């Protein structure tokens, strides 16, 4: 809940009649920063946001946060392409196994709906990140089928492309390269890259 997507979704939901919003992430520093930002910018809504430290790799930490939850946006992922190339099993543990853990915990807790975030890189994947996200989608589909048969949560998945200025986006990288007079690192000059802003995502 502390990444680019989590920040944006939180701003959309903060002023609604939702009674409680739970932010679940493994990054205590980002949680603390988010808490301070809420208290400074939205003091009247800050009390309805609760923070939980945990990791999708640890199913018990997911089970601990689930009671009373109705809807989940699952955005936890390793998404840096180079990191996933160098450490592919870490991508599997978070993106594939972590998603499976989350969905099992959600089904056990009787959550109503789970929306999982994937990437356009899962279509015809050519790198470890895309492959791990494609496998994640298969895990989502399999769990959605089981959940539907059991009358459990509605589980769905959405793919989105490159989000401008999100963590790991190429835009800040390109800006820095231009400022420093460095060549822009484009893999293929004929490549097309689809970009959207955070609100569109």
Model-flagged regions — what are they?
Residues 36, 44-71:
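Conserved Rossmann-fold cofactor-binding substructure of NAD(P)-dependent oxidoreductases
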């Amino acid at each position: 809940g502390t990444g680019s997507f989590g920040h944006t979704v939180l701003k959309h939901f903060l002023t609604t009649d939702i009674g409680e919003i739970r932010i679940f992430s493994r990054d205590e520093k980002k949680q603390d920063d988010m808490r301070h930002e809420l208290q400074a910018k939205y003091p009247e809504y800050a009390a309805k946001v609760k923070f939980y430290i945990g990791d999708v790799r640890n199913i018990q930490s997911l089970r601990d946060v689930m009671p009373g939850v109705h809807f989940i946006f699952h955005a936890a992922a390793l998404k840096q392409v180079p990191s996933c190339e160098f450490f592919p099993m870490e991508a599997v543990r978070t993106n594939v196994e972590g998603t499976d853990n989350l969905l099992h915990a959600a089904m056990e807790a009787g959550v109503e709906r789970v929306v999982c975030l994937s990437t356009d890189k899962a279509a015809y994947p050519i790198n470890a990140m895309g492959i791990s996200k494609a496998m994640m989608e298969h895990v989502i589909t399999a769990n959605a089928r089981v959940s539907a048969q059991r009358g459990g949560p509605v589980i769905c998945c959405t793919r989105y492309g490159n989000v401008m200025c999100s963590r790991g986006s190429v835009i800040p990288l390109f800006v820095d390269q231009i400022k420093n007079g460095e060549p822009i690192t484009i893999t293929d000059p004929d490549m097309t890259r689809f970009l959207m802003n955070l609100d569109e995502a």
